[in-house]
Swiss-Prot record:
UniProt-annotated binding residues for Mg(2+) 2: E415
Known EC number: 6.1.1.6
Main localization (coarse): cytoplasm
Coiled-coil residue windows: none
EC category name: ligase
Cofactor annotation comment: Binds 3 Mg(2+) ions per subunit.
GO molecular function per UniProt: ATP binding; catalytic activity, acting on a protein; lysine-tRNA ligase activity; magnesium ion binding; transferase activity; tRNA binding
GO biological process: lysyl-tRNA aminoacylation
Name of this chain's protein: Lysine--tRNA ligase
A GO-annotated cellular component: cytosol
Organism listed in the record: Listeria monocytogenes serovar 1/2a (strain ATCC BAA-679 / EGD-e)
Subunit structure, interactors included: Homodimer.
Length: 498
């Protein structure tokens, strides 16, 4: 094992290794070859559930099954074991005179956790349990370590994350959650494809970290002798494709942000981003509403779900509210009538909202929203009209240029989507990038950098475009009632063990 040098072998580990030696001395490979299965334990449960003991005896149906030993008891020349394939268990009845003396000796050496192959016939025991009467027994893989207690699984949450393979063996809820994650991704792709979007792939390594306000991971390309960044968003390359005439595109991929971890944040996570030419942010609201409600219905059978203590109804039509109206409703502060940065700062001071040097009217409105409103939005709510200062890639609102045609979707007090009518004016975009650069000089290290290549692409003409970003991990958390992002990532980023 990989960490044998760092631990002393306890009695169980020693005994299991001695059994490996014994098997090899008898000419038996403890780590076997390919084994062809004709049926799974789950299929046996489904296909033969209504068959009586007599019907099964008469049919004498021969099968080939495999799985991990979860229980085992031996009495003389007879033994019983339950094997597990995923989370479906099947009882195996083993007689020495049926499988032969040599194979029975191997069975007696088997431990919980070993993976075995069985050939035999299906029957029903006197207690009514569907089982397989073995005629052949094959050891496929010897387990050198004992499994966690089968009745209690892994109680140490951190161990579940570090050793996900053990969690999947012992925790049916965890395994089902990852099956649901896979289905959510499939149904998401199906929905986007059916809406006429084309799935594409764009670079993971970027020359400029753009498309979001976040700290990047930095790497170095030796052959080109240049710094590169793991992407913090998918946006800017996808918009280039819209310029190139690919009218509706989407990508589901990993993005990387060199920031802290929490129950909602992991340094690498999965995003869906989509862009549709000749549409705006209101069209994207309709897309998101349809996507989330449809996928929820497909995986849960309903659009009414439970997340933690909350009952959430994802049935369209969802609430839509301007950010300034939301702050007015929940805080009682009317930012529509705030006319200067100084006035906004005074309001922030009065209401204990943190303000830093670079912040202006729009930043402060957003701080009010994040401090007092966001966590109160339990039912699905589109909050639109984000200030221009925090939306460098979004189109200004024609009626009030302090704001943009942008929205975020909030459910159970968390952001689940971010979208806007894309800024397609290259002159305005350059000015926004320059403003972001000034913020960076004033201490905002998450401000957007200048991307000259993207600006050049815009100068060829980006049609009016509706763009969307959805955090797939948060969506999976919501639809599977997972309290932490680590519960829906197979291998979350973890700190080194001491």
């Amino acid at each position: 094992m990989s960490n044998e040098n760092h631990e002393e072998l306890n009695d169980q580990l020693i005994v299991r290794r001695e059994k490996v030696d014994t098997l090899r001395e008898e000419g038996i490979d403890p780590f076997g070859e390919k084994f062809i299965r004709s049926i799974s334990p789950e299929e046996i449960e489904t296909k033969f559930a209504d068959k009586s003991k007599e019907e099964l005896e008469e049919a004498a149906i021969e099968v080939s099954v495999a799985g991990r030993i979860m229980t085992k008891r031996v009495k003389g020349k007879v033994g019983f074991t339950h094997i597990q394939d995923r989370f479906h268990q099947l009882q195996i009845y083993i007689r020495k005179d049926a499988i032969g003396e040599d194979a029975y000796a191997v069975f007696k050496l088997a431990d919980l956790g070993d993976i075995i192959g069985i050939k035999g016939t299906i029957f029903r025991t006197n207690t009514g349990e569907l089982s397989v009467k073995a005629t052949e027994f094959t050891l496929l893989s010897k387990s050198l370590r004992p499994l966690p207690d089968k009745y209690h699984g892994l109680k140490d949450v951190e161990q579940r994350y570090r050793q996900r393979y053990l969690d999947l063996i012992t925790n049916e809820e965890s395994q089902n959650r990852f099956v649901m994650r896979s289905k959510i991704l499939k149904y998401t792709r199906d929905y986007m494809d059916n809406q006429g979007f084309l799935e594409v792939e764009t670079p993971v390594l970027h020359t400029i970290a753009g498309g979001a306000a976040a700290k990047p991971f930095i790497t170095h390309h030796n052959a080109l002798d240049m710094e590169l960044y793991l992407r913090i968003a998918l946006e800017l390359h996808l918009k280039r494709l819209i310029v190139g005439g690919m009218d509706k595109v989407y990508e589901i991929g990993r993005v990387f942000r060199n920031e802290g971890t929490s129950t909602r944040h992991n340094p690498e996570f999965t995003m869906l981003e989509s862009y549709a030419a000749y549409e705006d942010y209101e069209d994207v609201m309709d897309l998101v509403e349809g996507l989330v409600s449809t996928v929820c219905k497909q995986v849960n059978g309903t659009t009414e779900i439970t997340y933690g203590e909350y009952k959430v109804d994802l049935t369209p039509n969802w609430r839509r509210i301007h950010m300034a109206d939301a702050v007015k409703e929940y805080v009682g502060v009317d930012f529509w009538n705030v006319t200067s940065d100084e006035e906004a700062r005074e309001l922030a001071k009065k209401h204990d909202v943190p303000v830093t040097e670079h912040m202006t009217y729009g930043h402060i409105l957003n701080e009010f929203f994040e401090t007092y409103v966001e966590e109160k939005l339990i039912q699905p709510t589109f909050v639109y009209g984000h200030p221009v200062e925090i939306s460098p890639l979004a189109k200004k609102n024609k009626e009030d240029e302090r704001f943009t045609d942008r929205f975020e979707l909030f459910i159970v007090g968390r952001e689940h989507a971010n979208a806007f009518s894309e800024l397609n004016d290259p002159i305005d975009q350059r000015e926004r990038f320059e403003a972001q650069m000034k913020e960076r000089e004033q201490g905002n290290d998450e401000a957007h950098g200048m991307d000259a290549d993207f600006l050049e692409a815009l100068e060829y003409g980006l049609p009016p475009t509706g763009g969307l970003g959805i955090g797939i991990d948060r969506l999976v958390m919501l639809l599977t009632d997972a309290p932490s992002i680590r519960d829906i990532l197979l291998f979350p980023t973890m700190k080194h063990r001491d």
